[in-house]
């Protein structure tokens, strides 16, 4: 038996790649300096994996921004608008990821979507009529050669053709089948080039196989692979799946002329059942047995019990998915040993794979005994009062009265907002000064009084600016918050916070998910102080800003000893208490963000309601069910596919919902219209995840497109998302254009 991983974190132990890349974006270092730093980081990571005793090391799992974008460049799926710019290859790459606005042209970034049911986001390639798929890139070969020069025979990794086609966008008049033959040739060219360099195997990632597949999709998969595998150029080919099981294509998959198949034994409900039904003796099974998405220690006894039931003769132990979804290492954390011993980040998961392999080979008795001892400990007790509160909930606790239509009329009369009311999503730019003051306060270098005075001053500035430029509903800017989940978690019992537990979310952006350690209750009011202060500075309504229970759960590392449903209800009651305190303090518009509602939706439609929506939607309703009818509840969602769960979103029973929409060309509007969506909506009118400022007329056109699909009485005008990561200059320029466009649109109503 041997060991491997599907992929390793890219940003570095201390987010070195992030900080170096951001220096490049600011023109503080050259492209050559960026590439050299990335090369050093890859070597460091390969060496860590090697020293931990992992026998098969992947390469090309690294990325400067996103591995899906890497594949687009590898296969020449690059829009003509970017090719026509006089930019270097690296500049083109970042233009697709972030947009480009300069002397050489103006192009928007490609759309960004959630990577299956994770908090990672991938850049969505677009096939045009002019797209000519071919082998065009060199990164996969360069990185294989880099590793080889270090004495490492790695297994190059690339997105497989089926997943690439399934997750890409297509221009009107273009479809996936148009590119099958060219993809077959391109992948075989990759095989040939790798074989020429001395590679012996390749990993093709096909997570799209774990979703519900139609007959046409299965036919596409088989057509691609029967032809690609007809000439493997001497390479051993591994088809790697993750995030679930492959029940729809298992029999077809095991009968392909492939050398190895990677299956997920952590999230794959039916994986063990499928394999027990038979696995070919001539193929190697890569068994994903160590959870790549959560940070709890692996229970060796449970994992070994699964492995003992696998009939495959040749097994390689691996992670259930890439380790980019967990932090780098626990070595830099400051938890007490009694706590820290329960956690395994990416580096520690390498140890777990090595331990399991050793135990399977009749060694490792000491590590097995230590693991048994760890799991024999009762980690944390239950909060009896909280459990009783949840047990006492009834249907009435999940129902807001009066119904939406009556509330809508009451609120329009109460607020007297103009048509197309304008607002922002919540946060304003957090400058170096803001971050420095927060850090100084946390280090006790700044007193509470000094910090409060600073926050009051900056809130005053932004309230005044919003009033001057003409926003209808204001926000306080969230300057006191480092992260929309961590900030709340710090005021809830049952939460722990890592010092360096960063995980890549998109591009160079990292998030530091808190850890749900025990039962969750609110310790004290969280947002009332600054929301009330901001409201006292203006006669216009100021939104209270909260993170919803499902998002807090989904953007935390959840417990594994109770269900995520029970954890979410605990969080919902804590946020409900905060909502009622805000309302009592005179905050009449309260936004409860559910940015991650879609994130943990099961990948198979048959599981959507029973396994998720049947408790996630009620959890949100529980939060706001008892507010007064003239209190307006907003929510916000971003960077996910929402069109297939529109009825469930309407059932949240919010009064207003804002969506990310600009990068996806407002595709959600047709579905809102078709589903007779009742909630008032604010489709984002410009993309905030790019530093690009909308051109004159651009937002006007977007608003026209919105009003063609949604009645003006139902429309709000807002950006896509919060503005925390943007610069002040670009933010004010973009928001001014938003307001000008909204005012112009009102004149035409």
UniProtKB/Swiss-Prot annotation:
Q: Does the keyword Methyltransferase apply?
A: yes
Reaction(s) catalysed by this chain, per the record, are: 5-methyltetrahydropteroyltri-L-glutamate + L-homocysteine = tetrahydropteroyltri-L-glutamate + L-methionine
Query: Which residues of this UniProt protein bind 5-methyltetrahydropteroyltri-L-glutamate?
Result: 15-18, 114, 555, 599
Give cofactor(s), names only: Zn(2+)
Any idea what this protein is called? Answer: 5-methyltetrahydropteroyltriglutamate--homocysteine methyltransferase
**Example of a GO MF term:** 5-methyltetrahydropteroyltriglutamate-homocysteine S-methyltransferase activity
Q: What organism, scientifically named, is this protein from?
A: Streptococcus thermophilus (strain ATCC BAA-491 / LMD-9)
Sequence positions that bind L-homocysteine: 425-427, 478, 593
Cofactor binding annotation: Binds 1 zinc ion per subunit.
């Amino acid at each position: 038996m041997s060991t491997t991983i599907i992929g390793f974190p890219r940003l570095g132990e201390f987010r070195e790649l992030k900080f170096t890349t951001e220096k490049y974006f600011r023109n503080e270092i050259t492209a050559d300096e960026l590439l050299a730093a990335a090369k050093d980081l890859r070597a460091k990571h390969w060496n860590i994996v090697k020293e931990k005793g992992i026998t098969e090391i992947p390469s090309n799992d690294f990325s400067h921004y996103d591995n899906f974008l890497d594949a687009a460049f590898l296969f020449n799926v690059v829009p003509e608008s970017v090719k026509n710019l006089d930019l270097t290859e690296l500049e083109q790459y970042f233009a697709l990821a972030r947009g480009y606005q300069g002397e050489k042209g103006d192009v928007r970034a490609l759309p960004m979507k959630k990577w299956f049911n994770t908090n990672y986001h991938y850049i969505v390639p677009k096939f045009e009529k002019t797209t000519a798929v071919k082998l065009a890139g060199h990164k996969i070969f360069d990185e294989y050669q880099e590793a080889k020069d270090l004495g490492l025979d790695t297994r190059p990794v690339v997105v497989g053709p089926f997943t690439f086609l399934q997750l890409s966008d297509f221009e009107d008049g273009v479809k996936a089948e148009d590119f099958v033959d060219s993809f077959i040739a391109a992948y075989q060219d990759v095989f040939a080039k790798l074989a020429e360099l001395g590679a012996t195997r390749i990993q093709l990632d096909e997570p799209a196989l774990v979703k519900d597949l139609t007959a046409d999709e299965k036919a596409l998969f088989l057509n691609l692979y029967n032809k690609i595998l007809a000439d493997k150029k001497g390479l051993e080919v591994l088809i790697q799946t993750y995030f679930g099981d492959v029940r729809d294509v298992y029999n077809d998959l095991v009968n392909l002329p492939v050398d190895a198949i990677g299956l997920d034994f952590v999230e794959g409900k039916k994986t063990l059942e499928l394999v027990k039904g038979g696995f070919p003796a001539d193929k190697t099974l890569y068994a994903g047995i160590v959870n790549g998405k959560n940070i709890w220690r692996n229970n060796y006894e449970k994992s070994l019990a699964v492995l003992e039931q696998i009939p495959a003769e040749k097994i390689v132990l691996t992670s259930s998915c890439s380790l980019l979804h967990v932090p780098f290492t626990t070595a830099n954390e400051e938890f007490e040993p009694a706590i820290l011993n329960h956690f395994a980040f990416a580096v520690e998961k390498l140890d777990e794979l090595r331990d399991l392999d050793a135990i399977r080979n009749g060694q490792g008795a000491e590590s097995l005994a230590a693991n048994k001892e760890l799991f024999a400990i009762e980690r944390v007790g239950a909060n009896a009062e909280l459990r009783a509160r949840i047990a006492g909930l009834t249907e009435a606790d999940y129902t807001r009265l009066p119904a939406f239509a009556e509330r809508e009329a009451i609120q329009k009369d109460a607020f007297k907002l103009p048509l197309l009311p304008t607002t922002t999503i919540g946060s304003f730019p957090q400058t170096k000064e803001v971050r420095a003051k927060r850090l100084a306060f946390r280090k006790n270098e700044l007193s509470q009084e000094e910090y409060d005075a600073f926050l009051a001053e900056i809130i005053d500035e932004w309230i005044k600016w919003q009033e001057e430029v003409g926003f209808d509903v204001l926000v306080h800017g969230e300057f006191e918050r480092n992260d929309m989940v961590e900030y709340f978690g710090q005021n809830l019992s049952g939460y722990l916070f890592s010092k360096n537990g960063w995980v890549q979310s998109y591009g160079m952006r990292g998030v530091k998910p808190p850890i749900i350690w025990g039962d969750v209750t609110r310790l004290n009011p969280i947002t009332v102080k600054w929301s009330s202060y901001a409201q006292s500075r203006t006669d216009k309504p100021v939104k209270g800003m909260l993170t919803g229970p499902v998002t807090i759960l989904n953007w935390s590392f959840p417990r594994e000893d109770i269900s995520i449903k029970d954890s979410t209800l605990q969080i919902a009651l804590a946020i409900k208490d905060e909502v009622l305190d805000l309302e009592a303090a005179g905050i009449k518009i309260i936004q409860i963000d559910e940015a991650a509602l879609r994130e943990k939706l099961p990948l198979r439609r048959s599981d959507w309601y029973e396994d998720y929506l049947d408790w996630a939607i009620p959890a949100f309703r529980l939060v706001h069910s008892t507010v007064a009818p003239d209190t307006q509840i907003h929510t916000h969602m971003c960077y996910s596919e929402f069109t297939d769960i529109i009825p469930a979103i309407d059932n949240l029973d919010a009064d207003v919902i804002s969506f990310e929409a600009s990068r996806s060309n407002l595709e959600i509007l047709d579905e809102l219209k078709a589903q007779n969506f009742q909630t008032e909506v604010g489709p984002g009118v410009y993309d905030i995840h790019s530093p690009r400022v909308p051109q004159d007329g651009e937002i006007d056109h977007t608003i026209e497109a919105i009003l063609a699909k949604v009645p003006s009485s139902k429309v709000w005008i807002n950006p896509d998302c919060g503005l925390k990561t943007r610069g002040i200059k670009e933010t004010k320029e973009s928001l001014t254009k938003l307001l000008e466009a909204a005012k112009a649109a009102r004149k035409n109503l």
